[in-house]
Each structure stands twice: as C-alpha cells, then as structure tokens.
Amino acid sequence: MYFGLSEDQEFFQENIKKFLDDNASVDVIRKIATDHPEHQKDIQEGLVSLGINSLLVPEEYGGLGLNILFATAVSQALGSGIAPSAFIGSYVMAPIAILNGGSEDQKKLYLPDIASGKISFAVGFSEFIGARENCEIIFKNGKLNGRSIFVLDSSDASHIMVSDKDGKIYIVSMNSEGLTKNPVSYTHLRAHETPLH
C-alpha cells in the first residue's frame, strides 16, 4: 500500500515551489517587510492563478473539487518557500465552513467567487476556540458587535468570517460600516526586550 502523494499532488506542489522560487526571493520578501505591499499582492495573484483558491471548492461551484490532502500538499509547498500569502483561512477554512454549515443559497453566493478569485476570506474563530476578555462576538437586532483577535489572512480579504462563543459563524464584508482592522506587529519583538512580571 502506497501512502505518498499522487503524481497530481506532486505536480501541484512543484508548480507552487517553482513559482515561489521565481517570484518570492528573500529580496522580494524584504521589500514586502519594509512596506512594499504591492509585491505581496503580485505573489498572491500568482498563487491564485495556479488554483490555490479553488482547491476545496466543488466543481459544481466552479472549483477544482479536490480534497484536504491536496490542500495539505499545497500548504507544505507554501511552507517550504517564503510565501507571504493567504491560504489556510481564505482557501481551506472558509470553503470548508461554507460547504458544511452554509445554506444552498450561501454556497451559491460565496463558493463561485472564492473559486474565481473574486473574493477571499479572513477567518477569526478565536471567540469560539478560546474566548478572551472583552472580545465577545454578539449578534443582536440584526447587528454583529464585538471583536475577534488573531484573524487569519486579513491583509487583503474582501470578507471576514467570525464565530461567536457558541460556534455560530457570521460573514461580514470588510467594507461594512463600523468594521475596523488593527494590525498587530511583532516583527521587532525580542526575548530580552519582553519584560516579565
């Protein structure tokens, strides 16, 4: 019995690795890190053109209809290089959540646009996984209030998927009135600079 990757999975991995080798050198990553986000967008668009966004979207919604093992192979390829791009939240967690928890109307609304690259998702499930003080997500009177911290893939997302403490999932456009995004930067954090009390 063979437990390795299939030829198709290896081919997909190799294409991603080659793309990253050609487009995400250490110099490019340094430019991104010094506030040149246009390079990050180019890398993300290139990876989307390879199909990372449509892996888990069924064919009936315009995707490739592949399985989680393909997503794992892609994740491994992204991790083997320097890939400053959205993946786990946008193209793994979001499609799986919509497929397993969304209505047919929601599937028709979101999945084709994920597969085409028209939309992408940030994912904030911290309230359900481990609620933090003053971060409660509350849906009341048709409005969603609260905050979610440590949101995955938020840099260029068009939508955010958040959960409340009971695991109910909500989708909000990143252009929604009252929604704010506060980036957290730890790039200059050093152990000796971090006081412990």
Write out the residue ranges for each language-model feature:
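Flavin-dependent oxidoreductase catalytic core characteristic
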Residues: 2-22, 139-141
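Buried hydrophobic positions in well-ordered alpha/beta secondary-structure cores of metabolic enzymes
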Residues: 9, 74, 103, 144-146
